[in-house]
Amino acid sequence: MARYKLTVCYDGSDYYGFQRQNNLPTVQQKLEEALSTRFQRQITVHPSGRTDAGVHAIAQVVHFDVDSEIKTSSFGYSINTLLPKDIAVTSCEKVSDEFHAQFGAKRKTYLYKICLCKIHSPLKRKYFHICFYDLNIAKMQDACKFFEGEHDFRAFMLANEEKENTVRTIYALSVEQADDEIYIRVTGNGFLHNMVRIIAGTLVDVGRGRIAPEDIPKIIESKRHVGTGKTLDPQGLYLESVEYI
């Protein structure tokens, strides 16, 4: 039995997240169907993590086991003929049996995209959070440093969710603007459910003047979701990269 690592890009617009669900289209379902067809046996994929409905991935990582040798250099081309056009395998690599896409991941980077629009943008609605008001980018950038480091991010998950360990480390958080588009990029050792979208919403509130940058440490220390910005839309979120040793 051999283990293979796939890097997968997908447009999450028409899927109910990554994880397989009964009677609902998901990315995992489409991947497993394609792989099972290719190898003529049931294949299960194990992702670096689950993405929610509407969330995209530039480079999701999964692994699977199969008792066949794969020509990795051309596997992406062949398997993509069995996948829908909104999912693509961009690389294939044979790995050791000890490799695990989820438990071996050391860093993940997410990208959140915001479009500053005066009117609704039909062409960007599936790929950006649409923002109809001006934002102070300098203040948003100033707030980033308060998120970096190891903190208990309990405030940055939904209030009705339970999680034993809510301590995470953010290695880098940045805000950049290019014309009418804003890119929030965050790298960490792991993220709570909705954490990136809540951080993005909090930075938007900083940009609107609703939250002062220097108030971020107090919000983190409070461990209460009530002080944060809202959870921004899923369609602006992209899993950009997953790093391993």
Pin down the residues of each PLM region.
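Structured-RNA-binding interfaces characteristic of tRNA pseudouridine synthases
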Residues: 1-245
